[in-house]
Amino acid sequence: MARNDIRPIIKLKSTAGTGYTYVTRKNKRNNPDRISLKKYDPVVRKHVEFREER
């Protein structure tokens, strides 16, 4: 099995419209749907929701 089969690299994009992204990995087997996490956006200096971008 290749390294990226089960845990691919994904981008989390800010919903605040700043264009700020986080890069992380996710387990496709445990989380087949798109991820949304609350993380810090330094552009607006707030915690906002980040959604998975494909």
Swiss-Prot record:
One of its GO terms (cellular component) is cytosolic large ribosomal subunit. It comes from the Bacteria. GO terms for molecular function: structural constituent of ribosome. InterPro entries: Ribosomal_bL33 (IPR001705), Ribosomal_bL33_CS (IPR018264), Ribosomal_bL33_sf (IPR038584), Ribosomal_zn-bd (IPR011332). Coiled coil: none annotated. The keyword Nucleotidyltransferase does not apply. One of its GO terms (biological process) is translation. Keywords: Ribonucleoprotein, Ribosomal protein. Belongs to the bacterial ribosomal protein bL33 family. This is Large ribosomal subunit protein bL33. It comes from Corynebacterium diphtheriae (strain ATCC 700971 / NCTC 13129 / Biotype gravis). The gene is rpmG.
